[in-house]
């Protein structure tokens, strides 16, 4: 077994799927760790091509020889809620002004998508997490 490479950095970014380019904020974040920015952009765009239109969080692990690996996550819950509700952004005052509503089925669908990245053991717990996020955005959950 080859010796393990030493990790020198962990970078977390949220980038539009298939739209990574060397401009800020990606360029400076990777540049300070000495990563080949174009190489990352090409690899990320190829990996997320099928999910165009979504924001995809990515975790980039940088090694001391300036090589890197990256893991893509599921889109943020807030983005999925906004897409399902059909709103551009959440409410500025979520407890007084409601901007949209979601059904239980829509919440379950979002929870199923996010289950792998959520700190939840089952789908019911994941649903509660998603419903809480929706509430804090001014989106009501109806039965």
Curated annotation (Swiss-Prot):
The keyword Phosphoprotein does not apply. GO terms for molecular function: large ribosomal subunit rRNA binding; structural constituent of ribosome. CDD domains: Ribosomal_L11. One of its GO terms (biological process) is translation. Pfam families: Ribosomal_L11, Ribosomal_L11_N. One or more lysine residues are methylated. NCBIfam families: L11_bact. HAMAP family: Ribosomal_uL11 (MF_00736). Belongs to the universal ribosomal protein uL11 family. This is Large ribosomal subunit protein uL11. The lineage of its organism: Bacteria, Bacillati, Actinomycetota, Actinomycetes, Micrococcales.
């Amino acid at each position: 077994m080859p010796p393990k490479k030493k990790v020198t950095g962990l970078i977390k970014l949220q980038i539009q799927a298939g739209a990574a380019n060397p401009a800020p904020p990606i360029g400076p974040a990777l540049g300070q760790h000495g990563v080949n920015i174009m190489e990352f952009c090409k690899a990320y765009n190829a990996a997320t091509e099928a999910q165009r239109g979504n924001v995809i969080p990515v975790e980039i692990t940088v090694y001391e020889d300036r090589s890197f690996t990256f893991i893509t996550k599921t889109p943020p819950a807030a983005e999925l809620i906004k897409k399902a509700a059909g709103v551009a952004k959440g409410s500025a005052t979520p407890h007084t002004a409601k901007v949209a509503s979601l059904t239980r089925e829509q919440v379950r669908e979002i929870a199923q998508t996010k289950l792998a990245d959520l700190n939840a053991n089952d789908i019911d717990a994941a649903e509660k997490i998603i419903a809480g996020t929706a509430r804090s955005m001014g989106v009501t959950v109806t039965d």
